[in-house]
């Protein structure tokens, strides 16, 4: 299928202050956005794609100055792809607090003339949705044909259908959960502890010291990657294969250097992540994950929390995803059915664990393609 080709981000500036769930206020902030396809005259074919932890506004296509900069969901979004940009106008937004151009910890705090660092206020999924709604307003979009996301992006899609029910026709929530389990919060805490205990963290003001807490970021990313893959997938990819620096494949080195393929993979992913991601942003986003719990205000009753939704839903999960297991998606499905909402649900038998939502699986893509065909017929796209 054809790639969407060369794309370019745009920066949108917002002068109206944004009051956060914590009570803090962000004023004069900016959000980086990318769009693909054309908005129709009725402004009825817009789809918002919400990103997960380490992703960004760059959903699809490549940048002219970097042919390797393929968007994180390029296999899903583009001409002739499941989310077909010949029919839909697709928006990707880099969330507030991120490190890819939107206002966040790396931005200059106008009150001090220095980067916010750890002083940047804690943000929530709900804060992101309110900020994204202002992006929609700027484009003149009153109602999205769909809001879609996987993992943390799926939480944002679900939050959209709760917070702006009249502005979402379809909610597409993939490999997600209505709230984090204690185990998931624990994984996030271990990752944050690795960053906070790095001597280069400097209380979050490492920018002034010209350093980055890379050791902590590496460990945080390694922990994350373990949870994104299934046991079977790791066994197939790595098994107990050795990878020694001296090239030997059949003997132990009796040291603590890298010896196993899986060790090499985790260190590579950790190093790569630490080079491009910001530690303060990692802390913020994992805390936003922890806090997401729309049923909390309803004494834990998810059915009550979803009572005022109006959208139609596609909920999808993956059989080997143990980070956000299929049972968590089924909780959402049950609550929606209890409210007599229109719900399509699929549990896809895929070996790749949580990361399966990012991969080009024919059954998964055919599901999304068919669902978007239905949406296209509804909006005349």
Swiss-Prot record:
The entry's protein name is: Homoserine O-succinyltransferase
One GO process term, biological-process aspect: homoserine metabolic process
Protein family according to the UniProt entry? Belongs to the AB hydrolase superfamily. MetX family.
Q: Which SUPFAM superfamilies match?
A: alpha/beta-Hydrolases
A Gene Ontology molecular function term for this protein is: homoserine O-acetyltransferase activity
Organism whose genome encodes this protein: Burkholderia ambifaria (strain ATCC BAA-244 / DSM 16087 / CCUG 44356 / LMG 19182 / AMMD)
Transmembrane portions of the chain: none
> NCBIfam families, per this entry?
homoserO_Ac_trn (TIGR01392), PRK00175.1 (NF001209)
Q: What HAMAP family does the database record attribute to this sequence?
A: MetX_acyltransf
Catalysed reaction equations from the record: L-homoserine + succinyl-CoA = O-succinyl-L-homoserine + CoA
Keyword Iron among UniProt keywords: no
Residues bound to substrate are 221, 355
Per UniProt, subcellular location reads as: Cytoplasm
**Which pathway is recorded for this entry?**
Amino-acid biosynthesis; L-methionine biosynthesis via de novo pathway; O-succinyl-L-homoserine from L-homoserine: step 1/1
Q: Which residues form the active site?
A: 151, 321, 354
Relate the protein's function as given in its record. Answer: Transfers a succinyl group from succinyl-CoA to L-homoserine, forming succinyl-L-homoserine.
> Do the record's keywords include Amino-acid biosynthesis?
yes
């Amino acid at each position: 299928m054809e790639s969407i080709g060369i794309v370019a981000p745009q920066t949108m500036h917002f002068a109206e202050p944004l009051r956060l769930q914590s009570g803090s206020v962000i004023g004069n902030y900016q959000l980086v956005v990318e769009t693909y396809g054309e908005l129709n005259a009725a402004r009825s074919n817009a789809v918002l794609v919400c990103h997960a932890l380490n992703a960004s506004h760059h959903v699809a296509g490549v940048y002219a100055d970097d042919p390797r900069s393929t968007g994180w969901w390029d296999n899903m979004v583009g001409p002739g792809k499941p989310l077909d940009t010949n029919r839909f106008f697709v928006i990707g937004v880099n969330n507030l607090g991120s490190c890819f151009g939107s206002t966040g910890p790396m931005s200059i705090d106008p009150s001090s003339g220095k980067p916010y660092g750890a002083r940047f206020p804690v943000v929530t999924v709900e804060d992101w949705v309110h900020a994204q709604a202002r992006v929609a307003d700027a484009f003149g979009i009153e109602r999205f044909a769909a809001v879609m996301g996987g993992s943390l992006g799926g939480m944002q899609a679900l939050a959209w259908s709760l917070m702006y029910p009249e502005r979402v026709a379809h909610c597409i929530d993939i490999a997600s959960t209505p709230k984090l389990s204690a185990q998931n919060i624990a994984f996030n805490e271990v990752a944050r502890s690795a960053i906070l205990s790095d001597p280069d963290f400097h209380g979050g003001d490492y920018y002034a010291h010209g350093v980055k807490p890379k050791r902590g970021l590496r460990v945080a990313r390694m922990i994350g990657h373990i949870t994104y893959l299934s046991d079977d997938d790791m066994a197939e990819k790595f098994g107990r294969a050795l990878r020694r620096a001296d090239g030997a494949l059949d003997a132990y080195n009796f040291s603590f250097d890298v010896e196993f393929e899986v060790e090499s993979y985790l260190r590579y992913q950790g190093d790569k992540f630490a080079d491009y991601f910001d530690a303060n942003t990692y802390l913020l986003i994992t805390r936003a994950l922890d806090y997401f719990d729309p049923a909390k205000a309803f004494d834990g009753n998810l059915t009550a929390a979803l009572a005022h939704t109006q959208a139609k839903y596609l909920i999808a999960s993956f059989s080997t995803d143990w980070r956000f297991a299929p049972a968590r998606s089924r909780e959402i499905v049950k609550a929606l059915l209890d409210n007599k909402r229109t719900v399509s649900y699929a549990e896809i038998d895929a070996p790749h664990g949580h990361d399966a939502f990012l991969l080009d699986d024919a059954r998964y893509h055919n599901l999304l393609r068919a669902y978007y065909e239905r949406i296209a017929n509804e909006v005349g796209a």
